């Protein structure tokens, strides 16, 4: 399929990406039309997809997309959550028209509704989940491309790309590979240099996980600010004026403070001490008119 050209052969880094994302892992069921894409069956019943056939079909699909003069005439669809982000990224990279989420019945056949469109090529993520657009495409003679698993029905599918269309990483990687090949065949990017866009941007992420990561990052930032605030607080400034000493051999002149003078008393001039042995002087106290004499 690649025409035996070295430039179109699958590179080692591409194989490693396929294996890391689990693109070669199919399901436990096998459709009779998908037998030609199977390499072997594991002991646990899972079918292994031949990545060489996957790469050949990927190049064929990219050539079909490039053959459309107006990129907006290519409709890419994914009703499943795992492929919606990848479809939007693919559309942004290639100029295609994305339909992420529920497909409105009659989009390709009912001319009355506002969402009516007439694309020239249709690309779907899962033939089983996206059966409605495939059926309508058959009514209007619309060529179709689909990412097919081992148990996917190939009815109304013109170009089937065998891969794992269940895993989020596998679906994102396949759309990334397809977008890269389309841009390469159009001459937008070079085959000699790697594409600067990472496959991670095409992967589906659970909104709950994203919210948890944002909360954890916010808490970590607050903790870091508090920690830095405790240790980086400015030291108190002492504004007391220090005496300037030009010559350190000379002593610092301490300002003299006058000593307060207190009057001194002559203890010798005090009167003689009373005789404590004498009886105290009688004092009269009135307690209910009575007097007490101390004798």
Swiss-Prot record:
Alphabetized NCBIfam families for the sequence: uS2_euk_arch (TIGR01012)
One GO BP: ribosomal small subunit assembly
GO terms under cellular component: cytoplasm; cytosolic small ribosomal subunit; nucleus; plasma membrane
Chain segments carrying region Laminin-binding: 161-180, 205-229, 242-295
N-acetylserine: residues bearing it: 2
[DE]-W-[ST] repeats: 230-232, 247-249, 266-268, 275-277, 293-295
Quaternary organization: Monomer (37LRP) and homodimer (67LR). Component of the small ribosomal subunit. Mature ribosomes consist of a small (40S) and a large (60S) subunit. The 40S subunit contains about 33 different proteins and 1 molecule of RNA (18S). The 60S subunit contains about 49 different proteins and 3 molecules of RNA (28S, 5.8S and 5S). Interacts with RPS21. Interacts with several laminins including at least LAMB1. Interacts with MDK. The mature dimeric form interacts with PPP1R16B (via its fourth ankyrin repeat). Interacts with PPP1CA only in the presence of PPP1R16B.
InterPro entries in UniProt: Ribosomal_uS2, Ribosomal_uS2_C, Ribosomal_uS2_CS, Ribosomal_uS2_euk, Ribosomal_uS2_euk/arc, Ribosomal_uS2_flav_dom_sf, Ribosomal_uS2_vert
Function: Required for the assembly and/or stability of the 40S ribosomal subunit. Required for the processing of the 20S rRNA-precursor to mature 18S rRNA in a late step of the maturation of 40S ribosomal subunits. Also functions as a cell surface receptor for laminin. Plays a role in cell adhesion to the basement membrane and in the consequent activation of signaling transduction pathways. May play a role in cell fate determination and tissue morphogenesis. Also acts as a receptor for several other ligands, including the pathogenic prion protein, Sindbis virus, and bacteria.
Residues at the site labelled Cleavage: 115-116, 133-134
Residues with the Phosphothreonine modification: 97
Main location: membrane
Cellular localisation: Cell membrane; Cytoplasm; Nucleus
Extra remark: This protein appears to have acquired a second function as a laminin receptor specifically in the vertebrate lineage.
Region annotation (Disordered) ranges: 266-295
Keyword Cell membrane listed: yes
Positions of modified residues (Phosphoserine): 43
Superkingdom as given in the UniProt entry: Eukaryota
Single GO term (MF): structural constituent of ribosome
The keyword Membrane appears for this protein: yes
Modification after translation: Not glycosylated. Acylated. Acylation may be a prerequisite for conversion of the monomeric 37 kDa laminin receptor precursor (37LRP) to the mature dimeric 67 kDa laminin receptor (67LR), and may provide a mechanism for membrane association.
Descriptive protein name: Small ribosomal subunit protein uS2
Location of the region described as Interaction with PPP1R16B in the Swiss-Prot/TrEMBL record: 54-113
Glycyl lysine isopeptide (Lys-Gly) (interchain with G-Cter in SUMO2) cross-link site: 89
Family to which the UniProt record says this protein belongs: Belongs to the universal ribosomal protein uS2 family.
Assigned keywords, A-Z: Acetylation, Cell membrane, Cytoplasm, Host cell receptor for virus entry, Isopeptide bond, Membrane, Nucleus, Phosphoprotein, Receptor, Repeat, Ribonucleoprotein, Ribosomal protein, Ubl conjugation
């Amino acid at each position: 399929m690649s025409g035996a050209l070295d430039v179109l052969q699958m590179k080692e880094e591409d194989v490693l990406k396929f294996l890391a994302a689990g693109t070669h892992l199919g399901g436990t069921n096998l459709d009779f039309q998908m037998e030609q894409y199977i390499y072997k069956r594991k002991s646990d019943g899972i079918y292994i997809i031949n990545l060489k056939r996957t790469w050949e079909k990927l190049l064929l699909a990219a050539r079909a997309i490039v053959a459309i003069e107006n990129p907006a005439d290519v409709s890419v669809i994914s009703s499943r959550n795992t492929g919606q982000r990848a479809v939007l990224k693919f559309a942004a990279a290639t100029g295609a028209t994305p339909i992420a989420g529920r497909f409105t019945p009659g989009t390709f056949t009912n001319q009355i509704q506002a969402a009516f469109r007439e694309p020239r090529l249709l690309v779907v993520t899962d033939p089983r989940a996206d059966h409605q657009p495939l059926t309508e495409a058959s009514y209007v003679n619309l060529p179709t491309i689909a990412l097919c698993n081992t148990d996917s029905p190939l009815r109304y599918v013109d170009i089937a790309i065998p891969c794992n269309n269940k895993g989020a990483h596998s679906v994102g990687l396949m759309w990334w590979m397809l977008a890269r090949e389309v841009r390469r065949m159009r001459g937008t990017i070079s085959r000699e240099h790697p594409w600067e866009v990472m496959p991670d941007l095409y992967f589906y992420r659970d909104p709950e996980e994203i919210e948890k990561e944002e909360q954890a990052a916010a808490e970590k930032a607050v903790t870091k600010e508090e920690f830095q605030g405790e240790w980086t607080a400015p030291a108190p400034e002492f504004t007391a004026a220090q005496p300037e000493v030009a010559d350190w051999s000379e002593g610092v002149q301490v300002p003299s403070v006058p000593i307060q003078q207190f009057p001194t008393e002559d203890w010798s001039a005090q009167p003689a001490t009373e005789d404590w042995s004498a009886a105290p002087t009688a004092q009269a106290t009135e307690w209910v008119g009575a007097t007490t004499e101390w004798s």
